[in-house]
Amino acid sequence: MPNFVATSLKNLKFPFGADGVEFLWSAKAGDESLIYTKTGKKEFFLLVKDKKTEFVVKSDKLTRPASLGTIQKALSVYKDLNVLDLKSSTIAIKNEKQLAKKEFILNDIQFLEKLKSGEFKKIFVEIGFGSGRHLLYQAKTDENTLVVGIEVYKRSCEQVNNLALSMGLKNVILLNLDARLVMSLLHSNSVDRLFLHFPVPWEKSEKRRVVSAEFANECQRVLKSGGSFELRSDDKNYTDFTISCFLNLKEAKMEIYKNRFLDVSSKYEDRWIKQNRDIYDVVFTNLIVSEQKVLHGDFEFGTVLEEDILSKFENKTIKKDDYFIHMERIYKKDSSEKNGGLLLRVAFGSFYRPEHCFILVENSKASYFIKKPLLTYENLKAHSTLKEYLSCSTS
């Protein structure tokens, strides 16, 4: 990721900025300072690491925007305004493409807003789209269908984003998120087709597989009646495992194929065919209408006193049966006032899809800052425990 190293800084007074980039305030913890940065509608932190003889400046991982160009521009402006002596830099903006908006790459909040619009009557979801060949084929074949791709590798998301732009597509969403998280966000009876093509088998670690008993239940919940989940794999053991998971559902209609020809193939499939490997397809068709999943609650804190937090905060983990809370770090905002404010970095929620958030505490109030948690069962339970911990007076 882009960064630069400086031997000395000007330490300008906040706020300052230029060229559409604003640096509004900072918060410090030990050798780290977080710089609250805004450029257009984007807000995030730059991280300044004091290594005694030099300062390393880069983007904070938790709030990092998807656009590499946005990060590079913010770092470049900060460097030009607040650096006295520069040692090294890897933030050169090579071309305008790096500043271009990643039109199809959405975060979880943007994804939910898109779903609320109801623009498309049909939804396809592909987990692990890789090079995007199959996903783009589906989007091009039926432009009235919203095609959602989930991929953990950011580079793949960026490459497919550029391909979708070049093809002039308007019905694609790319999510650089965990598939289990995305599945939990989808409404019941909302998806027409769900694809999982050539997943990693994880032969020695079944827990890391996409498919599980819980995944099968979630597939049945999110699929419309008549909707389908389609696995395509060259691994017979994974195929058998998938069949067993879906057969454990109360109702299951399944079709199984061997070496079936499809109109589009992935680069992995092309490789396996050249090696004369068998290809297996499992198609599960949903026959039921599921109840809507309704969650009640909010992420408000109420009164929170800074002095109480300062007196009891420690790096600790609270573990419960189905969620956890990790109090990671506390930063103090720079301010001329006595109580300038605190910034807490926390992780919480489900063990397999944790949230990472900042909590801003000032004027006896607390709120999630920049990124709010998703409304999930585990997050609500974790928030309740976190609220109790932060609001509990030590006096």
UniProtKB/Swiss-Prot annotation:
Annotated metabolic or biological route of this protein: tRNA modification; N(7)-methylguanine-tRNA biosynthesis
SUPFAM superfamilies in alphabetical order: S-adenosyl-L-methionine-dependent methyltransferases
Membrane-spanning residues: none
Taxonomy, superkingdom: Bacteria
Catalytic reactions on record: guanosine(46) in tRNA + S-adenosyl-L-methionine = N(7)-methylguanosine(46) in tRNA + S-adenosyl-L-homocysteine
EC category name: transferase
One Pfam entry name: Methyltransf_4
Residues that coordinate or bind substrate: 204, 234
This enzyme's EC code(s): 2.1.1.33
Gene Ontology cellular component list: tRNA methyltransferase complex
Any GO MF annotation of the entry: tRNA (guanine(46)-N7)-methyltransferase activity
Entry keyword set: Methyltransferase, S-adenosyl-L-methionine, Transferase, tRNA processing
Residues annotated to bind S-adenosyl-L-methionine: 126, 151, 178
InterPro entries listed in its UniProt record: SAM-dependent_MTases_sf, tRNA_(Gua-N-7)_MeTrfase_Trmb, tRNA_methyltr_TrmB_bact
Sequence similarity: Belongs to the class I-like SAM-binding methyltransferase superfamily. TrmB family.
Function: Catalyzes the formation of N(7)-methylguanine at position 46 (m7G46) in tRNA.
HAMAP family documented for this protein: tRNA_methyltr_TrmB
Protein name: tRNA (guanine-N(7)-)-methyltransferase
Source organism per UniProt: Campylobacter fetus subsp. fetus (strain 82-40)
